A protein has these predicted regions:
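Active-site proximal loop and beta-alpha junction motif in alpha/beta enzyme cores
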Residues: 4-72, 82-142
C-alpha cells in the first residue's frame, strides 16, 4: 500500500493517510490502526483515517479511532479527511466533498475561510440491554 499522510486537528488529533488503493478493512485496518494509533510519535494516541480519492470530490474512507478501534463512521474523521484533501490539493475548497464510510456517506465542505461544515444522516446502528449488578461497598466505606 502506497500512502502519504497529513496530520489534522479538528478538536481531536487525526492522522489522514491517502492511498491509491481501496482503504484497508478488517484485520488489515486493525493492524495498521493499532500500529499508527499508538505510535510513539503520538503520545496521547491518534485517530487514523485511510482515504482513497475516487473522484475530484469523493473519497472512500475507513476509520480507526484511538479509543474504540474500527468504526462505521466518524464525523470529526470525515472533516479531517476533507480538510487534508483540500490542503493537499486533492479536492477543491468550497465544494461539497462526499466522504464514503462503511456506515454511510457524509458531505463535508471546507469553506474559503477554513470553516468546515458537515452534513449527514444520523441512524441507530445497534441496540442492546446492559445489566448492572449492585456491588457491596468495601468494609469501612459508607
Amino acid at each position: 500500500m502506497c500512502i502519504r499522510d497529513s496530520g489534522v486537528a479538528v478538536g481531536n488529533p487525526h492522522c489522514v493517510l491517502f492511498t491509491h488503493e481501496p482503504p484497508p478493512a478488517g484485520a488489515e485496518l486493525a493492524a495498521w490502526g493499532r500500529a499508527l494509533g499508538h505510535h510513539p510519535a503520538f503520545p496521547g494516541g491518534i485517530n487514523v483515517e485511510f482515504a482513497q480519492p475516487i473522484s475530484p470530490t469523493g473519497l472512500a474512507v475507513t476509520v480507526w479511532e484511538r479509543g474504540s478501534g474500527a468504526t462505521l463512521a466518524c464525523g470529526t474523521g470525515a472533516c479531517a479527511v476533507a480538510a487534508a484533501a483540500v490542503l493537499t490539493g486533492r479536492c477543491p475548497r468550497g465544494a461539497p466533498i462526499l466522504v464514503q464510510l462503511p456506515g454511510g456517506t457524509l458531505e463535508v465542505c471546507v469553506q474559503r475561510d477554513d470553516t468546515v461544515l458537515l452534513t449527514g444522516d444520523a441512524a441507530a446502528t445497534f441496540s442492546g440491554t446492559v445489566l448492572i449488578q449492585p456491588c457491596k461497598a468495601p468494609r469501612g466505606v459508607v
